[in-house]
A protein has these predicted regions:
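Rossmann-like flavin
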Residues: 99-210
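Helical element adjacent to the flavin cofactor pocket in flavoenzyme catalytic cores
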Residues: 158-159, 187-246
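Extreme N-terminal leader/targeting segments of oxidoreductases
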Residues: 1-43, 61-62
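N-terminal Rossmann-like FAD-binding beta1-loop-alpha1 element of flavoenzymes
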Residues: 41-69
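Glycine-rich, N-terminal phosphate-binding loop of Rossmann-like dinucleotide-binding domains
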Residues: 48, 91, 252-253
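Conserved N-terminal glycine-rich FAD pyrophosphate-binding loop of Rossmann-like flavoproteins
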Residues: 73-110
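C-terminal catalytic lobe of FAD-dependent flavoproteins
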Residues: 317, 323-445
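Active-site substrate-recognition segment that forms the wall
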Residues: 85, 120, 128-136, 224-226, ...
Length: 457
């Protein structure tokens, strides 16, 4: 595990995360098996999450091209089965103004139009494939934790609507308290459409099932130990088998085994994100904070929290965490999240937390997704770096990778509708061995700024 950024506890591929999602997975009907013996496939996809499954699904559906998906764990073992279930706009950690300076207004507008299309793509797959998911909400809410934050958010909402053409709404503090919820950190909000919440693991399993029915082979609990290029093609070896493929799609995102190929070394920065969920809340407890919304929500803290009320009235609350990925660090992250949650909603201070889990979100050095072919080997494709908005962005990325394979020649040609800001591989992070440490420093600084801002409110 020397090649991994975090503690080995983050990479226990044979152990499911102890999450609410794993406890309620629905019907696991997709046919999968370990990779045994020597197999052959035109296209091998490393990663059984949304990116890899979407690539395989769209290759089969749109181009009648079959492929093989290989994952070190089970389907949805990584971020695809651990996230908060926000199907919302984002995919970048860069400010819109900076994006416009770098790529131009038209490309940024194209990107956000693609984000809307990505959300609707997820909705279409869920409906078309009859995936057992209760879609919740219609907008993402960003709630202000101070009156100053509300002014900033309102200006941001007007910009996104007037310049980017997004559907936004500005909500006053009183309106929000009456129609959404009330708390100690509620000074109004903004909303942006479309957005909805899902059961993320059920979506991954449903996507795998749909791909499997179209002829995609699913190999699970099959960690790739080596990757070599030969005149016959790429050979991916596991402990009990191998697969020979003409093309490889690298779709592992935050759990990227970057040691397998030097071209991917230090291209990503995985960041721990932790989630806690309560027991189902009683109606009287919901009334204590006048909770009325099922929209996915984030707050305006520097170290953003994300939260939503689930269909069974459990409350999900998440945020970024600073640790080495060991169990002691995880416990500290969960305790910190619970402390913040119960500070914001004090009437819930005695509500029990029933599930706690964590995983990775994936950043790139340019703070936008990284999608395409390797310049030095166009038979290798990749898609990663969704910055905490992977449900829709990774599904769309898989669709784009399928189009590259199905429609573009083996050069650097990209689909016309793919924005420039996501094309090609991102630059390497500097001082790669120190990535986790300067990340920890950044998170501590953000937490300090959040505390100072609240004390001066």
């Amino acid at each position: 595990m020397k090649h991994r950024i975090y503690n080995k506890a983050m990479y226990q591929f044979d152990s499911p995360e102890d999450s609410l999602w794993e406890a309620t997975p629905g019907n696991r009907s997709a046919i999968s098996q370990k990779l045994l013996g020597d197999q052959i496939s035109d296209i091998a996809i490393i990663g059984g999450g949304y990116t890899g499954l979407s690539t395989a699904y769209h290759l089969a559906k749109k181009y009648n091209i079959t492929s093989s998906v290989i994952d070190a764990g089970h389907i949805g073992w990584g971020a695809s089965g651990r996230n908060g279930g926000f199907c919302s706009m984002g995919g970048t950690a860069e400010s819109i103004n900076t994006l416009i300076k770098k790529y131009g207004l038209e490309d940024v507008k194209k990107y956000y139009q693609c984000q809307i299309e990505a959300i609707e793509l997820v909705r279409k797959i869920i409906i078309d494939e009859d995936i057992d998911i209760n879609i919740q909400g219609k907008a993402e809410i960003e709630v202000a934790r101070s009156s100053r934050d509300h002014e900033v958010l309102a200006s941001y909402a007007r910009f996104r609507q007037d310049v980017l053409g997004l559907k936004t709404n500005i909500i006053s503090r009183d309106d929000f308290a009456e129609n959404y919820f009330d708390s100690t950190e509620q000074f109004g909000a903004i909303s942006v459409e479309p957005t909805f919440g899902i059961h993320p693991l059920r979506y991954a399993i449903g996507l795998a099932d749909a791909a499997s029915k179209k002829g995609v082979k699913l190999y699970t609990n099959s960690e790739i130990l080596s990757w070599n290029k030969t005149p016959k093609g790429h050979i991916l070896k596991t402990s009990q088998g191998s697969i020979l493929a003409k093309n490889v799609v690298f779709a592992t995102n935050g759990f990227m085994p970057e040691h397998l190929l030097s071209s991917f070394y230090s291209r990503s920065l995985p960041i721990i994100s932790s989630i806690i969920t309560t027991r189902p809340l009683r109606q009287s407890e919901l009334d204590d904070h006048n909770w009325k919304t099922d929209d996915p929500i984030i707050n305006s803290r520097k170290l953003v929290n994300y939260f939503r009320m689930l269909p069974d009235k459990r409350f999900l609350f998440g945020g970024r965490g600073s640790s080495a990925g060991d169990m002691n660090g995880a416990r500290k992250n969960y305790m910190y999240l619970e402390k913040i949650m119960k500070k914001i909603w004090p009437h819930w201070k005695n509500v029990e937390i029933e599930y706690k889990w964590h995983g990775f979100v994936c950043f790139t050095s340019r703070l936008t997704p990284s999608i395409g072919r390797l310049d030095n080997d166009p038979s290798i494709l990749f898609g990663f770096g969704y910055h905490g908005n992977g449900v829709n962005t990774s599904t769309w990325t898989g669709y784009q990778l399928a189009k590259i394979i199905g429609e573009c020649d083996k050069s650097n040609q990209y689909p016309d509708d793919m924005p420039n800001m996501v094309r090609g591989i991102s630059e390497k992070f500097p001082l790669s061995s120190l990535r986790r440490y300067y990340l920890q420093f950044m998170i501590r600084m953000y937490r300090l700024r959040d505390s100072l801002e609240m004390s001066s409110k």
